[in-house]
Structures are given as structure tokens and as C-alpha cells.
Amino acid sequence: MRSFCIAALLAVASAFTTQPTSFTVKTANVGERASGVFPEQSSAHRTRKATIVMDGKANAIRDRITSVKNTRKITMAMKLVRAAPKVRRAQDAVLATRPFSETLQSVFGGLIQRLGGESVDLPLLTEREVKKVTLLVITGDRGLCGGYNSFMIKKAEARFNELKKNGVEADLILVGKKGIAYFERRGFPIRKKYETGQNPTAKQALAIAEEVSSTFLSGESDAVELLYTKFVSLIASSPSIRTLVPFSASDITAKGDEVFQLTSESGQFGVERTELDVAAPQEFPNDMIFEQDPIQIVNAILPLYLNGQILRTLQESVASELAARMQSMQSASDNAGSLAKQLNLEYNRARQAAVTQELLEIISGASALD
């Protein structure tokens, strides 16, 4: 009986090891017990190898734990290695275009003041009765970014239906693979499609700006509305809509820009937003003679301003998408950590059940031999 008690203790001890434990128990046969000769004293004995064998469920849990931990490593890497640097690049791109926008705003303001109350012909500032609207919708090219794409698509679809309900015709200019795929499948009228990727360029913005201005100036649309995701913070974004053309002179000269800056402290990312002052109108002396008519200069500046606004919007949308992806990867990592803890508890319970079952079998075997 002593040998079986030793075996039982070994089985209990093996429950606290990380791997299944094998041990050898030398037990006396019935004849040896009857004669009072034990295995330690006789060469006639048999060996029984006892191993705590995990059942299929426990093995499946162990494999799942490994899979969850590997997934968590991937999501953390996507957040730290891929998303964060791209947000910084988008931030730097916005800051780099700011001087150009400020100069255009300043020159435009100065020319408007120089023209004073004159009746001027500025086609991109001319308002007319709205019978048809073109929606410029900016979405992302990829998924794994939470509700970034779905929120923008829902807002665009709601605005389209609102215009139709009010008797206003509407069509779409789409930027981004996700929006293109969604609206194409549902048969929406699409005027033009663009894919700008994660690093929008001035050339891509120029192509979109030319399409927008030609659509408005040709009279095919009476207004173009811009729908994009405004970058608020790393954990929040705001689907926004505003009229892109016709421009309002007061909006151009009276609104300052907001810039964002990605910060990090104690391993945590954050965003600082700064509202910039309006660029002061450039002063042109009354005796200054322009080689070209000021109206022609303004008409030349407005397309450049439109191009700059679209480029800035594309860059801000990319920053919003990347921030949403960072947050999505952080949530996925947190969920993976919680799931791994839960699975570890289940695995330990399964191991405990296997140890208990093995112990009961040993004790039952000992009782049967007595």
C-alpha cells in the first residue's frame, strides 16, 4: 500500500508542473504481497509507468492560448511599428503645407480688400439655385480601422438620400477603395473614382480639384459638398460635411486652420490640437500697379486654394484612418490579453481535473489489490 501512496503523491506533485509528468512506480504482485516480500527486496517485480495525460479539450485550449498570444503580438506590432509612424508622417505633411495655405489666404484677403465693393466676376464664388449637388466622399483603402469607413459611408448615404428627398439631384465623386466598393455594389451614380493610398500627393489632389472645379464651372452641379473624417484625437474622429464650392469669401479670409501634433508620454500616445490665427490680409498700396487685373489674379488663386484644401483634407482623413487603426489594434490587443487569461484559467481547471482523475484511478487500483 505504501507504494501506491507514493504514486498518489507523485501524481499530485505533477499537477503543478508545466508539462505532463511521467513517473515509474514499482509495485509488488499478489504473490510477493502474500509472502511479505516487497519489490525493494525482490528482483521479481513489474514496472507500471503512470503519466498524467491531458484530454483533447485541454490540448485544444492550450493551442488556442498560443494562437491568441501570437495574435496579440501582431496587433501590438501593427499599432507601434506601422500606425504610429504613419500618423506622424501625416501630421508633418499637414504642417508642411501650412505656409502655402497661409500665403494664399493672405494674398486673397488683400486682393478682396483692394477690390473693395466692386462688382467682380469670380465664378468659384458665384452662388446659384441648387438643383444638383455632387458629393465628394473620402474613405479609406483598407479595413481593420474600427468604424472609420462605415461611419463615413453611412453619413454620405444619409446625405444623398436627404438631397433626393428634397428634390435635389445628386451624384458622387469617390476617394478610397472602401467607398468605391460600397457605392458601386448598390448602383449609386458615380461621377469619378480615385485611389490616393496612405500618402496623398499634391498631384492627386490637383486631379480631384480639377474635377471638382470643372463640374461646378460647367454647370453640371450647382454645389460640391465635401464629406471627410475630421481628425479629433487618437480615440475619436468626427465625420464632417461642408460646402467645398462655391467658395465664400468670408470663409476664406475669416477662418483659421487647426493643426494636430502626435505626442507620447510614458509609452502612451496623445494628440495636441492647435488653432492657428487667420492669416492677415496682405496690404497692397493703392498706387501699386498689377501686371494682370486683380480679378484675374483672384481667379488664378482660387483653384490653388481649392487644391490646397483638398490635399489637406486627404492628409487629415489619412491621419484619422491611421488613428482609428491604432485604437482598433489597441482594443484587439487588450481583448487578446483578457481572452488569454480566461483560457489559462480554463486550461488549469482541465489539468486539475486530469490530475484528480489520475489520482482516483491510482487509489482505485490500490484498493482492488488489497
Curated annotation (Swiss-Prot):
PROSITE patterns: ATPASE_GAMMA
Location in the cell: Plastid, Chloroplast thylakoid membrane
UniProt cross-references to Gene3D superfamilies, sorted A to Z: 3.40.1380.10, ATP synthase, gamma subunit, helix hairpin domain (1.10.287.80)
GO cellular component terms, A-Z: chloroplast thylakoid membrane; proton-transporting ATP synthase complex
Residues at the active site: C145
Alphabetical list of InterPro entries matching this protein: ATP_synth_F1_ATPase_gsu (IPR035968), ATP_synth_F1_gsu (IPR000131), ATP_synth_F1_gsu_CS (IPR023632)
Membrane topology classification: Peripheral membrane protein
Predominant cellular place of this UniProt entry's protein: plastid
Annotated organelle transit peptide span: 1-54
Cited CDD domains: F1-ATPase_gamma (cd12151)
Entry's Gene Ontology molecular function annotations: proton-transporting ATP synthase activity, rotational mechanism
Superkingdom of source: Eukaryota
SUPFAM superfamilies, sorted: ATP synthase (F1-ATPase), gamma subunit (SSF52943)
UniProt keyword list: ATP synthesis, CF(1), Chloroplast, Hydrogen ion transport, Ion transport, Membrane, Plastid, Thylakoid, Transit peptide, Transport
Quaternary structure and partners: F-type ATPases have 2 components, CF(1) - the catalytic core - and CF(0) - the membrane proton channel. CF(1) has five subunits: alpha(3), beta(3), gamma(1), delta(1), epsilon(1). CF(0) has four main subunits: a, b, b' and c.
Function: Produces ATP from ADP in the presence of a proton gradient across the membrane. The gamma chain is believed to be important in regulating ATPase activity and the flow of protons through the CF(0) complex.
Family in the record: Belongs to the ATPase gamma chain family.
Name used for this protein in its record: ATP synthase gamma chain, chloroplastic
Underlying gene: ATPC
